[in-house]
Amino acid sequence: MEIKEKTMEDQKVAIMNYKGALKDMDVLVSKLTGWIEVEEIETAGDLFAIFYNNPRTAKENEVVYDVGIPINPELDPDETEEIRIVTLIEHKVLSGIHNGSLDNIQESYNIMAEYSIENKYDIIGSPKEIYLKNKYEVDNEEDLVTEIQLPVIKMG
């Protein structure tokens, strides 16, 4: 797995906050993409999720996460009860690509965590998964491509 440091520029996103089961993400994605289509909002990137606790260890209905998608920064769409418009501010991340099923994505997280320690990075925020090729676009789970981003600062 190739891991590299990247600087993420400010990014305007449409985002939904959620606490519940990870399997509910499909419903959230449907609501978000439906809203984008109805409101004719120009997107500027791929669907993503930010996890505030570990979905693999949290109780089933207590996973805390956001689902979002970058939008054209010049747009100023109206928010809904569930969908907010926010700007993610510029920050540094360690980025790695996970290929294949999300069932074994924890292995990629472990590799990235080891890399961060070995290279003196401090992970300072919640991980973000960007679904470059998501399950709505591919027929086989092995064709999934997910970018993992860990917000970091370089130590020493």
Model-derived regions: residue spans:
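A solvent-exposed interaction/effector surface
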Residues: 1-156
